[in-house]
UniProtKB/Swiss-Prot annotation:
Family: Belongs to the class-II aminoacyl-tRNA synthetase family. Type-1 seryl-tRNA synthetase subfamily.
Protein name: Serine--tRNA ligase
Main location: cytoplasm
Keyword annotations of the record: Aminoacyl-tRNA synthetase, ATP-binding, Cytoplasm, Ligase, Nucleotide-binding, Protein biosynthesis
Source organism of this protein record: Picosynechococcus sp. (strain ATCC 27264 / PCC 7002 / PR-6) (Agmenellum quadruplicatum)
Pfam families with a match to the protein in the record: Seryl_tRNA_N, tRNA-synt_2b
Binding site for L-serine: T236, A237, E238, E290, S390
Lineage: Bacteria, Bacillati, Cyanobacteriota, Cyanophyceae, Oscillatoriophycideae
GO CC terms in record: cytoplasm
C-alpha cells in the first residue's frame, strides 16, 4: 500500500510513476479529494471536541462560583454541549466511511516502480542483464519437448490426471516423483546453507493474508477459494510466510530475517486460455521453493541482489543455462517496485522461459500487513522492506532438466548434484 502522505506531498511524482506502469490506468486525484474531505471532518471534529471540553470546564467553574445548577445560564451551556455531542455523533460515521473509501482506493493502487526500473509498456521492453551457461546448452538435435520425453519415460501422466481433476494437472510417476522430491530437498538444502530458515506454512490462507501481500482485492479471480470458509489455496508461499509477521513489531537487531519454504501452489490461471496448454509450464497445481526476506530499508537494494544470486545458484549448480532480465515498469507485478526474472533455456522451443521472479516490494507489503521494526534507543517504528523470489519453481526446473539433459538414446541424464538424492545417473 502506498503512504497517503506521499500522495499528499508528491502527487505529481506518484502519478508519473503510476503512469509508467500503464498510462491512464491509475488515478490518485479521487483519493486526494476524499482525503481533503476526511481531514476537513477531522478538523471540524477537533474544534467541536475542544468546544465541548471548554463547556464542561465552564459549567464546573460557574457552579463553583455560585451559579444555580438549574439556572438559565447553565441550561444554555448544557444545551450547547448536547448539541455538540450530537454533531460529533453525526460526524463519526461520515469520517469512518471516508476512511474506508480511502483505504479501499489505496488497496487498488499498485506499488510505484523504483526510479532505477526501466520504463516500458510490456515484456518486450524488459532489459537483459546477463546470461549464464551458454557452454551447457545441448548440442544434440531433435530434442523432444519435456512432456513428450516425460510420457515416453512413463514419468509424467497428463491424460489420466484430467480424469482425476481437469486439464492443467499432472501426476508424477516413479522416477518423475523421485525427481520432484530430489529437487525440493536439494533446493531447500542449498538455501538453508545460504542462511535461510525453513518454514512449512499453512497452504490454506485467509483473506487478510492475501490482502497483506497484494493478491487481494485485485486478483481474486486468479486464486482458488473454499466455498464455506474464509480460506483460499495459496498461490505462492510468499503469502503465508510474509503474513507470519503480520501486525508485528520486530527488533531491528534481528533483521534481516530469511525464510525458505516449500509448498504446493494453486492458481486458476485466469486469462491464460490457450497458453502453454501442454507440459509443466502452466499448471493449476505446482510445487515451488520460495525465498522470503524481511530487511532494513537501508539494505534492501543489496539484499535484492543477494536474493537473485541465491536463486541463480540453484540453476548454476544444476548447470542449466539461463538469463536474467530486469523487468520494465509495464511488466512489474502489482506489489513489486523492482523485479528481476530468471529465465531457463528450453531447447525444444529454442527459447528462455521464466523460472523465478525476484522482487523487492520495499515497504508496500509491510504497510498493508502492518509489519514494522524498532531500533534500540530510537523513538517510533518503521516499516520493514520485504523481498521474495522463487528458488525455484519445481515443475519448470524439471522441464528444463528433461530437455537440457536429454540423451540421443532416449534417456535423460540426472544432474550430478541430484545423483546423491536420486541414487541413479539416468531417468
Amino acid at each position: 500500500m502506498l503512504d497517503i502522505k506521499l500522495l499528499r506531498e508528491n502527487p505529481t511524482l506518484v502519478q508519473e510513476r503510476l503512469d509508467a506502469r500503464k498510462a491512464g490506468e491509475y488515478a490518485i486525484q479521487p483519493i486526494l479529494d476524499l482525503d481533503i474531505q476526511q481531514r476537513t471532518l477531522e478538523g471540524d471534529r477537533s474544534q467541536l471536541q475542544a468546544r465541548s471540553n471548554e463547556i464542561g470546564k465552564l459549567i464546573g467553574q460557574k457552579i463553583k462560583g455560585g451559579a444555580d445548577p438549574k439556572g438559565e445560564e447553565i441550561a444554555t451551556l448544557k444545551a450547547e454541549g448536547n448539541e455538540i455531542k450530537q454533531k460529533l455523533a453525526d460526524l463519526e460515521p461520515q469520517e469512518k466511511e471516508l476512511k474506508a473509501q480511502i483505504y479501499n482506493l489505496l488497496l487498488a493502487l499498485p506499488n510505484l516502480p523504483d526510479q532505477s526500473t526501466p520504463v516500458g509498456t510490456n515484456e518486450t521492453e524488459n532489459v537483459e542483464v546477463r546470461r549464464w551457461g551458454e557452454a551447457h546448452k545441448p548440442t544434440n538435435e531433435n530434442i523432444l519437448p519435456h512432456w513428450e520425453i516425460g510420457e515416453q519415460l512413463g514419468i509424467l501422466e497428463f491424460a489420466r490426471s484430467v480424469k482425476v481433476a481437469q486439464s492443467r494437472f499432472v501426476s508424477l510417476v516413479g522416477a518423475g516423483a523421485a525427481l520432484e522430491r530430489a529437487l525440493i530437498n536439494f533446493m531447500l538444502d542449498q538455501q538453508i546453507a545460504a542462511g535461510y530458515v525453513e518454514v512449512m506454512p499453512p497452504v490454506l490462507i485467509n483473506s487478510d493474508s492475501l490482502t497483506g501481500t497484494g493478491q487481494l482485492p485485485k486478483f481474486a479471480e486468479e486464486s482458488f477459494r473454499c466455498a464455506d470458509d474464509d480460506l483460499w489455496l495459496t498461490p505462492t508461499a510468499e503469502v503465508p510466510v510474509t503474513n507470519l509477521y503480520r501486525y508485528e513489531i520486530l527488533e531491528a537487531e534481528n533483521l534481516p530475517i530469511y525464510h525458505c519454504a516449500y509448498t504446493p501452489c494453486f492458481r486458476r490461471e485466469a486469462g491464460s486460455y490457450g497458453k502453454d496448454t501442454r507440459g509443466l509450464i502452466r499448471l493449476h497445481q505446482f510445487n515451488k521453493v520460495e525465498l522470503v526476506k524481511f530487511v532494513h530499508p537501508e539494505t534492501s537494494a543489496a539484499e535484492h541482489e543477494k536474493l537473485v544470486a541465491n536463486a541463480e545458484a540453484i540453476l548454476q549448480a544444476l548447470k542449466l543455462p539461463y538469463r536474467v532480465l530486469e523487468l520494465c515498469s509495464g511488466d512489474l507485478g502489482f506489489s513489486a517496485g523492482k523485479c528481476y526474472d530468471l529465465e531457463v533455456w528450453l531447447p525444444s522451443a529454442d527459447t528462455y522461459r521464466e523460472i523465478s521472479s525476484c522482487s523487492n516490494f520495499y515497504d508496500f507489503q509491510a504497510r498493508r500487513a502492518g509489519i514494522r521494526f524498532k531500533e534500540a534507543g530510537k523513538k517510533g517504528t518503521q516499516f520493514v522492506h520485504t523481498l521474495n523470489g522463487s528458488g525455484l519453481a519445481i515443475g519448470r526446473t524439471m522441464a528444463a532438466i528433461l530437455e537440457n539433459y536429454q540423451q540421443p538414446n532416449g534417456t535423460v541424464a540426472v544432474p550430478e548434484v541430484l545423483r546423491p538424492y536420486l541414487k541413479r545417473d539416468f531417468l
